[in-house]
Amino acid sequence: MGKTLSEIAQQLSTPQKVKKTVHKEVEATRAVPKVQLIYAFNGTGKTRLSRDFKQLLESKVHDGEGEDEAEQSALSRKKILYYNAFTEDLFYWDNDLQEDAEPKLKVQPNSYTNWLLTLLKDLGQDSNIVRYFQRYANDKLTPHFNPDFTEITFSMERGNDERSAHIKLSKGEESNFIWSVFYTLLDQVVTILNVADPDARETHAFDQLKYVFIDDPVSSLDDNHLIELAVNLAGLIKSSESDLKFIITTHSPIFYNVLFNELNGKVCYMLESFEDGTFALTEKYGDSNKSFSYHLHLKQTIEQAIADNNVERYHFTLLRNLYEKTASFLGYPKWSELLPDDKQLYLSRIINFTSHSTLSNEAVAEPTPAEKATVKLLLDHLKNNCGFWQQEQKNG
C-alpha cells in the first residue's frame, strides 16, 4: 500500500522496527542511521520529499510551548540544513542590459539566506567558496562578493593581472557555484560540531542541527567531476563525529554508486511513485548496478504487473525496451536476436504490433490471456538466458 511523501518523511526520521533471526525471529528497533541514501528516477518526488521532511521538522518544533513564532522559525531553521532545487531558486541574475552593467548574481533575502550568508561572512568563508567552485568549474573563473555577501560578480583571471569582467555564468556553472556555497557551509558545520564541548565551539549556530538533506547536487557536472564531488562529500560525511544525520537523494547511478561504496553505516532505499499519487520507500541492498539501473526498473515493473495479473498493452512496449537495452549492452546488432529461436518471428511481430498499437483505432486496452502469457514467457526467457542477477530476500 502506497504512502504520502509526508509519511515517508516521518519514516526517514523515526527509528524502524526490523526483524532479526537469532534462534528465532525477533523484532528490534533500529535507530535512525547516520546516512540514508535514496535513489529515484527524475520526476518521482525527491524534491517534494525534501520539502515535506523540512515541514515535518518544523511541525515538531511548533508543537513546543512557550515560544513565539519567530523563536520557533529560528529553531526549525537550525534543525535542518537542506540543499534542493528551491535552494538554487534563491539565487537570481540582475541584468541591466540598457546600461551594459556588470551582471550580478543576487540572493533572495529571506530568513534562511540571511542566516546562511551571515554565518559564511562571519566565519570568513568567501575564499573557501572560491576554492570549491574553481575545483568543479574553471580555476580562472573567480567569484567576487560584496561586503554583505548578497551580490556576486564573476571575472576570468588571466594570470598577468588582467581580468575579464562582465561575465555571466552558464546554468551549469551557476549550479556549481550555489553548491559550493552550500558545501562550504556544510564543511563548517561538520568541523564545528566535531568539537565535543559546545562551550569551545567557534559558533553555537549549529548546536540544534539534527539533519542535512541533500537532493541531487549539481546534476550538470560531467562524470569525472561528479565522481570527485561524491568522493569529497563522502569524505566530509565520514569525518563527522557528531550525531548529525544525512539524507541524500539522487537520480544519478554514478553519484549513488560512489556514495554507496565510500560510506559505511548507511541504509539505502529506492523511492517510487504510483499512479494514485502515493509513494513507496523500499530498502535495497547493493549498488545501483544491482538495484536501480533503468533496465532493472523495467524488469521489476513488468514482474510486478505479471504478479498482480495486471498486464496491459503498454507492458509490451516496456518489454521491447528491456530487450533493446539488454541487446545493446551485450553487443547484439538487433534486439530480436535475443528472442526464443523457435518463436522469434511470431513474437517479434507481436511486440512490434503492440508497441505501435496507438496507431490503430481497433486496439483494446485489455490484452488477451494469450498476450499476457507472452509477456511472461518473453521476460522469463530474457532473465534465464541473459544472466540477470536475482536479488535474494534479506532480513534487516
Swiss-Prot record:
What does the record say about the knockout?
Loss of ACNase activity.
- Give the EC number: 3.1.-.-
**Function description:** Anticodon endonuclease (ACNase) that triggers the cleavage ligation of tRNA(Lys). It is activated by T4 stp protein and masked by the prrD protein (the endonuclease subunit of EcoprrI). The prr locus restricts phage T4 mutants lacking polynucleotide kinase or RNA ligase; T4 mutants lacking these genes manifest a T4-induced anticodon nuclease (ACNase). It is thought that Stp and other T4-encoded ACNase factors counteract the masking agents, thus activating the latent ACNase.
Key word Nuclease present in the record? yes
Could you tell me the keywords of this UniProt record? Endonuclease, Hydrolase, Nuclease
- Under what name is this protein listed? Anticodon nuclease
> Which InterPro entries does this UniProt record tie to the protein?
P-loop_NTPase (IPR027417)
Q: Which GO terms describe its molecular function?
A: endonuclease activity
The UniProt entry, under Gene3D superfamilies, shows: P-loop containing nucleotide triphosphate hydrolases
Top enzyme class:
hydrolase
Coiled-coil parts of chain: none
